[in-house]
């Protein structure tokens, strides 16, 4: 399956289709969008975003705790879309505040 991913970035919103077996960060880059990242392994907060609609599977990550995930935070480098999803990017400062 493939889902519509909408990213709300500081530069504005971008939308693209993302297969459910491709990480959102990888697909965004494939489509020419620059997003912050560091480890690419779900072990830091550089790529953190916030899901405002839809669902993701980020079970490959280990940095976020249950409360942070419940608040909507997502690591885009290990997030697969599970539905059409909207994510606010560049949320590392908010996450670590």
Swiss-Prot record:
UniProt-annotated binding residues for [2Fe-2S] cluster: 39, 44, 47, 77
Cofactor note: Binds 1 [2Fe-2S] cluster.
UniProt KW Metal-binding keyword: yes
GO cellular component: chloroplast; chloroplast stroma
Major localisation: plastid
Transmembrane segments: none
GO annotation (BP), single: electron transport chain
PROSITE patterns: 2FE2S_FER_1, 2FE2S_FER_2
Cofactor annotation: [2Fe-2S] cluster
Keywords, in A-Z order: 2Fe-2S, Chloroplast, Electron transport, Iron, Iron-sulfur, Metal-binding, Plastid, Transport
Localisation per UniProt entry: Plastid, Chloroplast
Database matches in Pfam families: Fer2
Entry similarity comment: Belongs to the 2Fe2S plant-type ferredoxin family.
Protein function: Ferredoxins are iron-sulfur proteins that transfer electrons in a wide variety of metabolic reactions.
Protein name: Ferredoxin
